[in-house]
Amino acid sequence: MLILQAFIQSPGETFLNLGYITIRWYGLLISVSVLIGLFVSKKLAKARNINPEYISEILPSLIISSIIGARAYYVIFEWRLYSGENFFTSFELFNNIIQIPSFLAVWEGGIAIHGGLIGGLISIIYFCKSKKINLKTFIDILIPSIILGQSIGRWGNFFNNEAFGVPTNLPWKLFIPIQNRPLEFINYEFFHPTFLYESLWNLLIFIVLIITFNKQNKKDFFRPGFISCLYLISYSFGRFWIEGLRTDPLCIGGLPPFCDGGIRMAQFISIFLFSSGLIGIFFLRLRTYIGKNRKNG
């Protein structure tokens, strides 16, 4: 019963307070994701005869570019939350309170995975060109770690009491404190745990990608780039439907919680990425077909 209670109600965003420094769950989960991702990607790189140390080399720039991209994407579409009187926020450093621009306070939440993917992709392209590595193969190596990191990172939303869905009375409903509820749902206590839905969906994708990766050498169907396309299709499919439940969408031409008169940005991007994945697989299969005909001819 205690486990169930802890599951449906966040214990708070703070993992440990050491006085001079506060360790938050969000930061801890990101750190764990990076370490696990480093281990997984090195294993996959070795399986593709690519120097595993390349993973360690790209890691710093990949983290920085992904965080910058994820934060910038979110701030651009939610600038109203960081402008005017909200431009500065308080930050405690060695028992001293200082004022910093609120858009720099990443630890308070407010990042978007699609922006992180854009930032990370820029870093990967530059790295592959400088090292003369096959881009599609290298991305295929990194993708399973990325989706696993997304699965783990979603629990940061749980501890921050954010990114939840519309009200519900389902047995797995999530309690949200009144100060974290949208004004439209201020009188509701329980909401869809959309963080959990996406975390489990992403974990399932990770398993499928690893199975596919291990079969890539055995079947000609799975050419370099197939893992990346499969990720785009599967993640975008799940994100599209889960996004429809959320009360904090980034909107184009509308305002949360329903983007009335506009469109949810994440759903728009999901449609684009889903289509890109399908087109990518089509061209991969086309290249395989043409290659076989040339050999037979």
UniProtKB/Swiss-Prot annotation:
Major location category of this protein: membrane
Residue spans crossing the bilayer: 20-40, 57-77, 105-125, 133-153, 193-213, 225-245, 266-286
Pfam family, one: LGT
InterPro entries the record matches: Lgt
EC number: 2.5.1.145
UniProt GO molecular function: phosphatidylglycerol-prolipoprotein diacylglyceryl transferase activity
PROSITE patterns: LGT
Record membrane topology: Multi-pass membrane protein
Signal sequence bounds: none
Pathway assigned to this chain's UniProt record: Protein modification; lipoprotein biosynthesis (diacylglyceryl transfer)
The entry's keywords: Cell inner membrane, Cell membrane, Membrane, Transferase, Transmembrane, Transmembrane helix
Keyword Transferase among record annotations: yes
Localization terms from the record: Cell inner membrane
Gene Ontology biological process: lipoprotein biosynthetic process
Gene Ontology annotations for the cellular component aspect, listed alphabetically: plasma membrane
Annotated residues for binding of a 1,2-diacyl-sn-glycero-3-phospho-(1'-sn-glycerol): 154
Presence of keyword Ribosomal protein: no
Record-stated family: Belongs to the Lgt family.
Known function: Catalyzes the transfer of the diacylglyceryl group from phosphatidylglycerol to the sulfhydryl group of the N-terminal cysteine of a prolipoprotein, the first step in the formation of mature lipoproteins.
Name this protein carries in UniProt: Phosphatidylglycerol--prolipoprotein diacylglyceryl transferase
Organism annotation: Prochlorococcus marinus (strain AS9601)
